[in-house]
């Protein structure tokens, strides 16, 4: 959690926006995950969101669903994800890593056991898509005890009552879903409507607010970042990596995809 806080504090001090790429652990290959993470950092990533493959990713669109299926087919379970973070930490002790996934694998593992293992591996935060904030108290308490941030999600359809709860309990950063839909549906992105909401959230939240869903390139990243503390790019990056046959190709594609987004954010 401290790495996330330090990262955003430094960005804020320098007037910069956070660039947060999402990749699925184990895709395009088991061997590529850690090299791609390092490549993303070289290209300008401030935080890395690492997707935990799951068999029923209900909030994800076809691109990430297929990516998750491919990763699961290679054996990329929770143990693999934690080992990948551990390996990443051998060379990178500063870039925050946030796991993004669903509650079921965590519950099977045991929440406390998972939290302790995640921190030991070098994970800084966890975003559980299907954990309602009203039911998150016990999980948050365990995570806080071990130093793990529970990242919350808000969307255009989130009620005011729930927003109050999310803003008052936000840890690490608050992830604002720019539209009510699944990941990758960029045709639904309305930057004007999202900007209004982002301005409101940043005034209310006790943590930085980042925007995701529908961001696919430098232009959409720059537009969304105007009123956010950072942006998350996922489906477009996952698609760019999908058929990278070798680790070298995956590294090169990751850097080539992300570098223009970093440049666009730094021009704002």
From Swiss-Prot:
GO cellular component labels: cytosol
Entry's EC annotation: 4.2.1.20
EC primary class: lyase
Keywords from the UniProt entry: Amino-acid biosynthesis, Aromatic amino acid biosynthesis, Lyase, Tryptophan biosynthesis
SUPFAM superfamilies: Ribulose-phoshate binding barrel
Reactions catalysed according to its record: (1S,2R)-1-C-(indol-3-yl)glycerol 3-phosphate + L-serine = D-glyceraldehyde 3-phosphate + L-tryptophan + H2O
Disulfide bond positions: none
Pathways per UniProt: Amino-acid biosynthesis; L-tryptophan biosynthesis; L-tryptophan from chorismate: step 5/5
Residues in coiled coil: none
Molecular function per GO: tryptophan synthase activity
Pfam hit, one: Trp_syntA
Active site positions: 49 (proton acceptor), 60 (proton acceptor)
Role, per record: The alpha subunit is responsible for the aldol cleavage of indoleglycerol phosphate to indole and glyceraldehyde 3-phosphate.
Record-linked PANTHER family: TRYPTOPHAN SYNTHASE ALPHA CHAIN, CHLOROPLASTIC (PTHR43406:SF1), TRYPTOPHAN SYNTHASE, ALPHA CHAIN (PTHR43406)
Similarity annotation: Belongs to the TrpA family.
Record's subunit section: Tetramer of two alpha and two beta chains.
Protein name as catalogued: Tryptophan synthase alpha chain
Organism, as annotated: Xanthomonas euvesicatoria pv. vesicatoria (strain 85-10)
């Amino acid at each position: 959690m401290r790495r996330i806080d330090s990262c955003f504090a430094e960005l804020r001090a320098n007037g910069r926006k956070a660039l947060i790429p999402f990749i699925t652990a184990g895709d395009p290959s088991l061997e590529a995950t850690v090299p791609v993470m390092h490549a993303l950092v070289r290209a300008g990533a401030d935080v890395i969101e690492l997707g935990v493959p799951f068999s029923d990713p209900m909030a994800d669109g076809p691109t990430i669903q297929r990516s998750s299926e491919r990763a699961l087919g290679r054996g990329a379970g929770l143990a693999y994800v934690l080992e990948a973070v551990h390996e990443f930490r051998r060379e990178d002790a500063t870039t925050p890593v946030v796991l993004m996934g669903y509650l079921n694998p965590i519950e099977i593992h045991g929440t406390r056991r998972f939290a302790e293992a995640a921190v030991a591996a070098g994970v800084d935060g966890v975003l559980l898509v299907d954990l309602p904030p009203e039911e998150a108290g016990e999980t948050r308490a365990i995570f806080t005890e071990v130093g793990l941030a529970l990242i919350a999600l808000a969307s255009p359809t989130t009620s005011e009552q729930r927003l109050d709860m999310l803003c008052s309990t936000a840890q690490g950063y608050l992830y604002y879903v720019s539209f009510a839909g699944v990941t990758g549906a960029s045709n639904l992105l309305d930057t004007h409507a999202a900007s209004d909401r982002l301005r409101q959230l940043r005034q209310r939240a006790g943590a930085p607010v980042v925007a995701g869903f529908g961001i696919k390139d430098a232009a959409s990243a720059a537009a969304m970042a105007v009123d956010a503390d950072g942006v998350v790019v996922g489906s477009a990056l996952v698609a760019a990596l999908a058929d990278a046959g070798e680790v070298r190709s995956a590294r090169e594609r990751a850097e080539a995809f992300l570098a223009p987004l970093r440049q666009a954010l730094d021009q704002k």
